[in-house]
């Protein structure tokens, strides 16, 4: 069964194995993929689908050193190298769009960029920087509604850029404590406006991003990654988490996304994502 072909949206996959996203930090020039990155993915084109390393839709989302972006012409050209190399080997590939939000350090970011998040509370722990080694995470600036609207549009533009580069679609990284999950998680999102204060408010940013990306490139080209009981980057479970994610999945289901990718952090000490929750998300 693993080796049987599968149709994902309108995309024919040669088998049912998916290469999960893995941050590699090899984009040393202007956060653009290079020939080495293209070779890496081409070597793995035997998977039915590759999901790339986390790729920022914005200069403000480049929290880690040397991760790729998808907002500049140079980056789009770099991803075209990757897409062409994978397709030449018969593979399919989605770009994972990851805005790091508060999981960041200013030393890793280009000039003019800033660390942002749902609130102004820094992520606990350290972030590696090339300039000074491990440093405490930078304190973010709390995003206002104009910032949120701009970021939603950046995700949509990055989706268009991915398709323009020849990639087959995008996965929205809504897991592991990055910006989308920072809004979803009640331990991090303590806002009292329309983007917090309730399950509906906390879900709002994720839904707006997904809607914008679907409008930009089509529902069959957009998936999302979620970690309902995540423990990574100071998130953690909270009261009502299962009910919130079922409601989120229902709204995402109305958009007809290509897939939902669920991450289980039980190996890190978090509660496992129950079979019941997975079934309810799948409905």
What are the roles of these predicted feature ranges?
Residues 1-283:
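Flavin-dependent oxidoreductase catalytic cores
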């Amino acid at each position: 069964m693993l080796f049987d072909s599968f149709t994902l949206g309108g995309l024919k996959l040669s088998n049912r194995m998916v290469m999960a996203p893995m941050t590699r930090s090899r984009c040393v020039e202007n956060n653009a993929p290079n020939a080495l990155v293209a070779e890496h993915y081409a070597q793995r084109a035997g998977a039915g689908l590759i999901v790339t390393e986390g790729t920022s839709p914005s200069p403000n989302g480049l929290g880690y050193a040397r991760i790729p972006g998808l907002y500049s012409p140079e980056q789009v050209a770099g991803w075209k190298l990757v897409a062409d190399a994978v397709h030449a080997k018969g593979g399919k590939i989605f770009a994972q769009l990851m805005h790091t939000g508060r999981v960041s350090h200013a030393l890793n970011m280009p000039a003019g960029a800033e660390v942002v998040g749902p609130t102004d509370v820094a992520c606990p722990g350290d972030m590696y920087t090339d300039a000074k080694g491990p440093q405490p995470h930078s304190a973010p600036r709390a995003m206002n509604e104009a910032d949120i609207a701009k970021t939603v549009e950046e995700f949509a533009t990055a989706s268009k850029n991915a398709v323009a580069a020849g990639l087959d679609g995008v996965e929205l990284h809504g897991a592991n404590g990055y910006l989308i999950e920072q809004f979803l998680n009640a331990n991090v999102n303590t806002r009292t406006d329309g983007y917090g204060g309730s399950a509906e408010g906390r879900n709002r940013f994720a839904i707006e991003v997904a809607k914008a990306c679907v409008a930009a490139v089509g529902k069959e080209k957009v998936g999302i990654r979620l970690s309902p009981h995540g423990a990574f980057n100071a998130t953690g479970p909270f009261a009502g988490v299962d009910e919130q994610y079922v409601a989120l999945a229902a709204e995402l289901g109305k958009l007809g996304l290509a897939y939902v990718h669920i991450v289980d952090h039980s190996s890190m000490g978090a509660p496992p994502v129950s079979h019941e929750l997975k079934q309810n998300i799948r409905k």
